[in-house]
Swiss-Prot record:
UniProt topology in membrane: Peripheral membrane protein
Entry's Gene Ontology molecular function annotations: ATP binding; ATP hydrolysis activity
Function per UniProt: Part of the ABC transporter complex OppABCDF involved in the uptake of oligopeptides. Probably responsible for energy coupling to the transport system.
Top-level taxon: Bacteria
Family: Belongs to the ABC transporter superfamily.
Catalysis: reaction(s): a [peptide](out) + ATP + H2O = a [peptide](in) + ADP + phosphate + H(+)
Entry's EC annotation: 7.4.2.6
Name listed for the protein in its UniProt record: Oligopeptide transport ATP-binding protein OppD
Length: 323
């Protein structure tokens, strides 16, 4: 079976007055229909730029290189006219901040209906009925009444539900969720994750979940890709990454998760800061922060397969971590 999305050798670069920044560096992954890929990493690791590259939404000074094949169609450098036919209808995106992503001058109903009228050619009455139905699907109370309200009349969690409803209106085959639970309290986060799982089962939608919240990843993702400085550090199933991480950065992320059952008096952290993408260290970008770094790390490692398809970008053998 061919994957729904096949990304190979993806690069994203930005020309700045200080030089060229490589935000995404040789990214490779596949995604099947109905499955969920979590992309995790610190701020600036290239997670969101990967999504923008797939959607054709890079800033004016950005350029993309490589291949991203969606259902047999190459997305990279696809003309806007063709991209517009794919966006929303086949690939949708939930943007990072629900508090600012909706038009404050338009009622919620108008914004939802516009999607269906533009992409599906629905008349006003049909678009209204379908929008109410989708608001019901995302567990919006009094959905019909909410259609006549403005964004400022909604809480953050309610706005996020509207964003999810809008993204799913056209029944896309791929949903890209960029930090969908940012700025939401933990109760609402749990509701949103439950909702996405239900919608995935109902519509067989594939999801790319971009987040720095490892709890979110554990709750919804089948596959996980750990990114650092634009590169893949490790890639595998959620079980492999959470229970058998094989890269020092992945191990550091897992160790930094606060434990309710532990007796630790101090939180574990990864020393140092993410690198400046204009002045990356020689070789492995994580080496200045890695307690296991050796002279060999001055040469950039290659992604290698370790265990049942698990990939790692490190010179050190997995045996060093007793795995």
């Amino acid at each position: 079976m061919n994957p729904l999305l096949d990304v190979k050798n993806l690069y994203v670069r930005f020309k700045t007055p200080d030089g060229v920044v490589t935000a995404v560096n040789d990214l490779n992954f596949t995604l099947n229909a109905g499955s969920t890929l979590g992309i995790v990493g610190e701020s600036g690791s290239g997670k969101s730029q990967t999504a923008f590259a797939l959607m054709g939404l890079l800033a004016a000074n950005g350029e993309v290189e490589g291949s991203a094949i969606f259902e047999g169609k190459e997305l990279v450098n696809l003309p806007n006219a063709e991209l517009n036919k794919i966006r929303a209808e086949q690939i949708s995106m939930i943007f990072q901040d629900p508090m600012t992503s909706l038009n404050p001058y338009m009622k919620i109903g108008e914004q939802l209906m516009e999607v269906l009228q533009l992409h599906k050619g629905y008349d006003k009455q049909t678009a209204f009925a379908e929008s109410v139905k989708m608001l019901d699907a995302v567990k919006m109370p009094e959905a019909k009444k909410r259609m006549g309200m403005y964004p400022h009349e909604f809480s953050g969690g309610m706005r996020q539900r509207v964003m999810i409803a809008m993204a799913l209106l056209c029944r896309p085959k791929l949903l890209i969720a960029d930090e969908p639970t940012t700025a939401l309290d933990v109760t609402v986060q749990a509701q949103i994750m439950t909702l996405l799982n239900e919608l995935k089962r109902e519509f067989n939608t594939a999801i790319i979940m971009i987040t720095h919240d490892l709890g979110v990843v554990a709750g919804i993702c089948d596959q996980v890709m750990v990114m650092y400085a634009g590169r893949t550090m490790e890639y595998g199933t959620a079980e492999q990454i959470f229970y058998h991480p094989t890269h020092p950065y992945s191990i550091g992320l897992m160790d930094a998760i606060p434990r309710l059952d532990g007796n630790e008096e101090h939180l574990v952290t990864i020393p140092g800061n993410p690198p400046n993408l204009l002045h990356l260290p020689k070789g492995c970008p994580f080496s200045p922060r890695c307690q296991f770094a050796t002279e060999q790390c001055q040469i950039a490692p290659k992604l290698t397969t370790f265990n049942h398809g698990q990939l790692r970008n490190c010179w050190l053998s997995a045996e060093k971590f007793n795995l």
